[in-house]
A protein has these predicted regions:
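Catalytic-site signature of metal-activated, phosphate-bearing donor transferases
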Residues: 22-26, 49-223
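Acidic donor-binding segment of Leloir-type glycosyltransferases
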Residues: 1-14, 18, 57-60
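A short, glycine-/small-residue-rich helix N-cap motif at loop->alpha-helix starts
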Residues: 16-23, 29
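Alpha-helix termination/capping residues and helix-transition junctions
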Residues: 7, 33, 64-66
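Conserved acidic residues
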Residues: 37, 45, 66-68
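Active-site nucleotide-sugar/metal-binding loop of Leloir-type enzymes
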Residues: 26-38
Length: 223
């Protein structure tokens, strides 16, 4: 990724991995001189849809100064196909914010931006998380996620770390997602993974995305 970015003319800054995305991005905010009004956080396997690029080009130059962050609609692609069914649609994430107006909260995963001041507005069009991992790579990645989720659940149950300084206001959708995870953790072991897969694939219609939808929901549900 770094070599491709350099070839395309981008300035590449590297920093030793601190163990989680939140600390890495906050290091960037604190230590790198950023001379743009807005920051876009985009992973190597993500891209903006042409309609979103056009929308941003139209709205950013005249954006109200009271707006500090933009919430983008997330689309997911797996095995080269954009998924349209299941629970992949309707998710919104703040990925664009004014320089100096936001930081990531300190979590080992499921990190979210805390907007320091100003309001957040929604953009109409989507960006895409284009997952190109093999099944083997996918399961290894999600085993790592599962270990970190387990650590978060143990921390929440036994109060192993001080969470009093964490920002609480991440928006209704983020808090809803975390509440759902807490509810899931209280469900019967093993059965909850099976139930989650059935919910995603049958109830929410993931089956309508064909074999890509089955693989996506099966791997997400069981891993």
């Amino acid at each position: 990724t770094c070599e491709i970015a350099k070839e395309m003319g981008a300035e590449v800054i590297q920093h030793e991995w601190p163990g989680n995305q939140a600390e890495q991005f906050n290091w960037l905010i604190d230590n790198v001189s950023i001379n743009t009004k807005w920051i876009l956080r985009l992973d190597a396997d993500e891209y903006l849809m042409p309609d979103l690029i056009a929308e941003l080009n139209e709205k950013l130059p005249t954006m109200d100064e009271g707006v500090s962050a933009l919430s983008l609609s997330l689309a997911r692609a797996y095995c080269g196909k954009i998924l349209h069914h299941g629970i992949v649609n309707g998710i919104r994430i703040v990925r664009i914010f004014r320089t100096g107006k936001a930081r990531y909260d300190k979590r080992i995963m499921d990190e979210h931006l805390s907007i320091l001041d100003g309001k957040t507005i929604e953009m109409k069009h989507q960006f895409v998380d284009d997952n190109r991992l093999t099944i083997g790579q996918f399961t290894i990645k999600h085993e790592n996620y599962a270990s970190r989720e387990a650590a978060i659940l143990l921390d929440a149950e036994y109060h192993l770390s001080d969470t009093s300084k964490l920002e609480k206001d991440h928006g209704e959708e983020v808090e809803k997602k975390r509440a759902q995870k807490a509810k899931y953790a209280k469900m019967p072991l093993f059965w909850r993974a099976f139930g989650y897969f059935i919910y995603r694939y049958i109830v929410k219609g993931g089956w309508r995305d064909g074999k890509e939808g089955f693989l996506w929901d099966f791997l997400q549900g069981w891993w």
